[in-house]
Amino acid sequence: MLKKSKVKEIQEKVYEALKKANIAITPEEKENIEVADFGLGDLENTGLQLLVYVNTDRYCAKELVLFPGQTCPEHRHPPVNGKPGKQETFRCRYGKVYLYVEGEKTENPHCRPPKGSEQYYTVWHEIELNPGEQYTIEPNTLHWFQAGEEGAIVSEFSSHSDDESDIFTDPRIKRIPEIED
């Protein structure tokens, strides 16, 4: 569980990272930065910071901010209410992000899963994204990603985002963060 004071501290850190990458946000957006530790209490290794610009029934746009070596755990976006699941395009804006998807296993991948969670990382086809590069993930595709040494900022453009419906390989994960005073 995250403390409100820790969330404020991380929001400030994300704001500074976005500024460094020349991505301007409003004070209101700064307050709306979501800090997700996935219920594991190890934000430094397993976590993600998100800023949603828009999320309608038809499309979604957000920034994903990862600190150096931080990992968003393996998950997929399944079909929901007759819709095929979220299709998303990741475009790297700053740093480097290693994306792992279904497909032929990459020999000698750059990343390792967080210690103690290795069994919950099953897809190993590596895609390296540098600033200006992008990759589209099809609906219901297992994927996970990890920031490089300087961290990463990734713009996500997708169909409707319904994070509550995401299915994570690790049964311990809680997608929606719990915040305490």
UniProtKB/Swiss-Prot annotation:
It comes from the Bacteria. Optimum pH is 6.5. Retains more than 50% of maximal activity from pH 5.0 to 8.0. It catalyses: D-lyxose = D-xylulose; D-mannose = D-fructose. Gene3D superfamilies: Jelly Rolls. GO terms for molecular function: D-lyxose ketol-isomerase activity; mannose isomerase activity; metal ion binding. Optimum temperature is 65 degrees Celsius. Highly thermostable at 80 degrees Celsius. Keywords: Carbohydrate metabolism, Isomerase, Manganese, Metal-binding. CDD domains: cupin_YdaE. Can also use Ni(2+), Co(2+) or Fe(2+), with lower efficiency. The keyword Membrane does not apply. The keyword Transcription does not apply. Its cofactor is Mn(2+). Its EC number is 5.3.1.15, 5.3.1.7. InterPro entries: D-lyxose_isomer, RmlC-like_jellyroll, RmlC_Cupin_sf. Sugar isomerase that catalyzes the reversible isomerization of D-lyxose to D-xylulose, and D-mannose to D-fructose. Shows optimum activity using D-lyxose as substrate, but can also effectively catalyze the isomerization between D-fructose and D-mannose. Homodimer. Belongs to the D-lyxose ketol-isomerase family. This is D-lyxose/D-mannose isomerase. It comes from Thermosediminibacter oceani (strain ATCC BAA-1034 / DSM 16646 / JW/IW-1228P).
